Regions:
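A structural signal for multi-pass alpha-helical bundles of membrane permease subunits
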Residues: 2-270
Length: 270
């Protein structure tokens, strides 16, 4: 695979981007041409009717807003908890540390289908089903373990001498963490935020099983609304998919800028 990428990088890019191109192509193809024209790289006539219908005549704007709230909140809380846990695992030795790490790893071994029923029974009496809060809690709980290990790897790469020098100059542990460690780990924080945001944005199983109300549904569940018993509205479904990709692309463009800033800031401060 590595040799193929080195010898044919252009083909790999085409292979990776073609599904996105086809998504866009179907989203602008009128319904009367979807099946009558056969397989074409570009429709003979393009239209934006599918986008207008998705925005004006469906609940997709509500699903989009719910996904944005859930994914953003989950990313912020998960990164905050993961940064604290990763820093603790990296810098401190305490009794039971490896047991805790092992238990966190074990939580990643169970398939989600196996634990969806217990989670539902746990959230139901608390009134957290059919709510965005319940999704945020579940998503945060499932993303924190991996995010913690990800953050720990970044903290491990930073020499402890930097903190010790700051503490010798009179800074306490928190001040050293905030002024020295955080700027150096901005790339790690950005990567963690991006990973958790993407995972929460595209998650379907919990969003489908824990919510039966459209008021608390996210866009992966909303895409199923374009599938009826006897037909599938491919045009509107693809248009909704394109609209759902936009915030993720914009988010990673924003994160990419901060990745570069974090690397340069770390080099200067180090």
């Amino acid at each position: 695979m590595g040799i193929f990428l080195r010898l044919h990088p252009g083909r790999f890019v085409i292979f990776a981007l073609f599904p996105l191109f086809w998504l866009l192509k179907v989203s602008i193809t009128p319904n009367d041409l979807l099946y009558s024209e056969g397989v074409r790289l570009w429709p003979s006539r393009a239209t934006a009717d599918h986008y207008a219908s998705v925005i004006a005549h469906s609940q997709f704007p509500l699903f989009f807003r719910n996904s944005l709230i859930v994914a953003t909140t989950t990313a912020l809380f998960s990164t905050l908890f993961a940064a604290a846990a990763g820093y603790g695992f990296s810098r401190f030795q305490f009794r039971g540390k490896y047991w805790i790490v092992g238990l966190m790893l074990i939580t990643q071994m169970f398939p989600l289908v196996m634990i969806i029923a217990p989670i539902f029974r746990l959230l139901k009496p608390l009134g957290l089903t059919n709510s965005l809060t319940g999704l945020v809690i579940v998503y945060t709980a499932f993303n924190v373990p991996f995010a913690s290990f990800l953050m720990q790897s970044f903290f491990d790469a930073i020499p402890k001498d930097l903190e010790e020098a700051a503490m010798l100059d009179g800074a306490n542990r928190f001040a050293a963490f905030r002024k020295i460690i955080v700027p150096l780990t901005l790339p790690g924080l950005a990567a963690t935020v991006g990973f958790v945001f993407t995972a929460a944005w595209s998650e379907l199983l919990f969003a489908l099983m824990l919510n039966s109300s459209s008021a608390a549904s996210t866009f992966p569940v909303g895409l199923l609304a374009f599938v009826s018993k006897f037909s599938v509205d491919f045009g509107q479904m693809m248009a909704a998919g394109v609209l759902a990709l936009l915030p993720v692309c914009m988010f990673f463009v924003f994160i990419q800028r901060y990745l570069v800033q974090g690397l340069t800031a770390g080099a200067v401060k180090g």
